[in-house]
Amino acid sequence: MEVRIINLEKKLINLKNIKKILSDKELLKFCRENEKFLNSYVRAKEFEEDFKDFSLNLYNSIIKYPNILDEIDKVVSNIVINKKEIGDKLLFLSELSNYNKNLDIIMFYGGFNDGICTYGDNIYYAMEWFINPDNINMKNDEIIYRYLKQYSINPEDIIYNTVIHEFVHICSCEIEDKSNPIWHLIEEGRAVYITNQLDKRDDLGLLMSENDLKWCKENEKYLFNEMFNVISENDENKYFDFISPRRNICGVSRTGYFMGYKLIETYMKTIDKLSQKEKIKKLLCTNETEVYFKTLRNMCL
């Protein structure tokens, strides 16, 4: 397995050209003509409105923060990624899951649309998430302000952590039954759990603030009772409140990632005789939900 790190900003396009574009139609045309830069969204061409929304995010963020491109350039210039270190961890996971494709980690600019995401067999990383928000005069009451303050302190650690997390999504078995939102809790939970086993840079691999994580630990029983009700009622909309970065559960965000981790951790204790490697392999090959629903129910008793 080969891991490549590609910087689209520096190698493929001068983003400042976007400033010259005035109309939505022209902007859409520009993005389509530069599909190498927008490779992560090539599939979205089939869905013009989605592609247009992404294009507008690019444009609007540049208008709102005029010096953002210069700040991104500084961030990219200062980041040093140890490709061997991260490649070794991804190779370990690929061998356990029998995943034999090469992986591109592509750095791009998403206009605060997506932070890090997977499309096909690649991982796409939006580098604007590592800007110090004070450097672009972002107001501290904006939702993403606190994330940027946290992520800009040590971008390399965040990249290592989240690339492992996203690769787990790529190389693991797809859960077959998606009729209930517990499938998503399992997917995020195993990604967080495996990341925590392989990389100890972040507490539990959750990328949560200290205060939010402290609150989750203190209110774990309440959270799981609420989650159990959501799962039992198959309330997908309410479930995604737990995943949201917008502080939807008692003023705390990303609670679902904490709960997914705890769900997987609790289940792992029932197979404690297995080695760490065997546990990770079992998680990567999980494609059913029933055993985790039983675990969730027992956590609420």
Where is each model-derived feature located?
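Amphipathic alpha-helical surface "interface" segments used
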Residues: 114, 212-219, 285-288
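Short coil/turn segments at secondary-structure junctions
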Residues: 70-77, 151, 244-248
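A metal-dependent hydrolase signature that marks the N-terminal structural subdomain at the beginning
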Residues: 1-120
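An acidic intrinsically disordered interaction segment
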Residues: 153-163, 212-235
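Post-HExxH zinc-binding segment in Zn-dependent metallohydrolases
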Residues: 1-30, 181-222, 299
